[in-house]
Amino acid sequence: MAAAVRSVKGLVAVVTGGASGPWLATAKRLVGQGATAVLLDVPDSEGESQAKKLGESCIFAPANVTSEKEIQAALTLAKEKFGRIDVAVNCAGIAVAIKTYHQKKNKIHTLEDFQRVINVNLIGTFNVIRLVAGEMGQNEPDQGGQRGVIINTASVAAFEGQVGQAAYSASKGGIDGMTLPIARDLAPTGIRVVTIAPGLFATPLLTTLPEKVRNFLASQVPFPSRLGDPAEYAHLVQTIIENPFLNGEVIRLDGAIRMQP
């Protein structure tokens, strides 16, 4: 029996951190392919204006991923507006560049900074996963038995963390580590879980760096020797949604880069 490849057309997708960068590009691609998108981001983001640009197929749901109350309210809003949730793309995250110990400054990494990154990137991702799984579990299964797809965002820093990335690497490594067990948890419900680990991408943060720095970073990518385009992240998201046999995987999207110390 041939497997049914699912189109994104007609699906409802929640994209956390969806107000900018590759995450906004993801929402734009999904809407362009006939899906409906819910941009979930913090209240002071550009989510409202970006959602309006995408038209009636997109709404903004203000929420902090670390808040159970706010995420549940955002998911309820999505279901009230569009009837169900088929896809969740977890992209919200923060980063700090702090050494564990800086000898010259005699400065020790604070627990507060470490906990803040873990709380947003790792616990925030799990918070969305568990709550959206509860919503997807109420969906009627498609002909292949699927009720939903959850896509998380890790980083190559999960595998080759750099100086000053202890907190960030730990948070992204946690997302990598929980992908398979959560996929196994949700398999009986018909919910797939896949994680993307991006390399160096042209995010709003990187594009503010001096051109010389951007060119150096791009030169570290074996092929193609450039920064990743947000559209390439969005393309992979669509591929994951449409391929029903992708489950429990962490996919590096990095041009074969392996970060050196």
UniProtKB/Swiss-Prot annotation:
PROSITE patterns: ADH_SHORT
GO molecular function: 17-beta-hydroxysteroid dehydrogenase (NAD+) activity; 3-hydroxy-2-methylbutyryl-CoA dehydrogenase activity; 3-hydroxyacyl-CoA dehydrogenase activity; androstan-3-alpha,17-beta-diol dehydrogenase (NAD+) activity; chenodeoxycholate 7-alpha-dehydrogenase (NAD+) activity; cholate 7-alpha-dehydrogenase (NAD+) activity; estradiol 17-beta-dehydrogenase [NAD(P)+] activity; isoursodeoxycholate 7-beta-dehydrogenase (NAD+) activity
Example of a GO cellular component annotation carried by this entry: mitochondrion
Knockout consequences: Conditional knockout mice are fertile but rapidly die around week 26. Mitochondrial morphology is severely altered in the central and peripheral nervous system, as well as in the cerebellum.
Residues with N6-acetyllysine modification: K53, K69, K99, K105, K107, K212
Subcellular location: Mitochondrion; Mitochondrion matrix, Mitochondrion nucleoid
Reaction catalyzed: a (3S)-3-hydroxyacyl-CoA + NAD(+) = a 3-oxoacyl-CoA + NADH + H(+); (2S,3S)-3-hydroxy-2-methylbutanoyl-CoA + NAD(+) = 2-methyl-3-oxobutanoyl-CoA + NADH + H(+); testosterone + NAD(+) = androst-4-ene-3,17-dione + NADH + H(+); 5alpha-androstane-3alpha,17beta-diol + NAD(+) = 17beta-hydroxy-5alpha-androstan-3-one + NADH + H(+)
Predominant location category: mitochondrion
The keyword Acetylation appears for this protein: yes
Enzyme Commission numbers on file: 1.1.1.35, 1.1.1.62, 1.1.1.239, 1.1.1.178
Chain sites annotated for binding NAD(+): S20, D41, V65, C91, Y168, K172, F201, T203
GO biological process: androgen metabolic process; bile acid biosynthetic process; brexanolone metabolic process; C21-steroid hormone metabolic process; estrogen metabolic process; fatty acid beta-oxidation; isoleucine catabolic process; mitochondrial tRNA 3'-end processing
Pfam families with a match to the protein in the record: adh_short
Enzymatic class: oxidoreductase
Active-site residue list: Y168 (proton acceptor)
InterPro entries tied to this protein: NAD(P)-bd_dom_sf, Sc_DH/Rdtase_CS, SDR_fam
Keywords: Acetylation, Fatty acid metabolism, Lipid metabolism, Mitochondrion, Mitochondrion nucleoid, NAD, Oxidoreductase, Steroid metabolism, tRNA processing
CDD domains documented for this protein: HSD10-like_SDR_c
Pathway assigned to this chain's UniProt record: Amino-acid degradation; L-isoleucine degradation; Lipid metabolism; fatty acid beta-oxidation; Steroid metabolism; Lipid metabolism; bile acid biosynthesis
Gene3D superfamilies named among the record's database cross-references: NAD(P)-binding Rossmann-like Domain (3.40.50.720)
UniProt: substrate binding residues: S155
Function as written in the Swiss-Prot or TrEMBL entry: Mitochondrial dehydrogenase involved in pathways of fatty acid, branched-chain amino acid and steroid metabolism. Acts as (S)-3-hydroxyacyl-CoA dehydrogenase in mitochondrial fatty acid beta-oxidation, a major degradation pathway of fatty acids. Catalyzes the third step in the beta-oxidation cycle, namely the reversible conversion of (S)-3-hydroxyacyl-CoA to 3-ketoacyl-CoA. Preferentially accepts straight medium- and short-chain acyl-CoA substrates with highest efficiency for (3S)-hydroxybutanoyl-CoA.
Known partners and oligomeric status: Homotetramer. Component of mitochondrial ribonuclease P, a complex composed of TRMT10C/MRPP1, HSD17B10/MRPP2 and PRORP/MRPP3. Interacts with TRMT10C/MRPP1; forming the MRPP1-MRPP2 subcomplex of the mitochondrial ribonuclease P complex.
UniProt family annotation: Belongs to the short-chain dehydrogenases/reductases (SDR) family.
Name of the protein described by the UniProt record: 3-hydroxyacyl-CoA dehydrogenase type-2
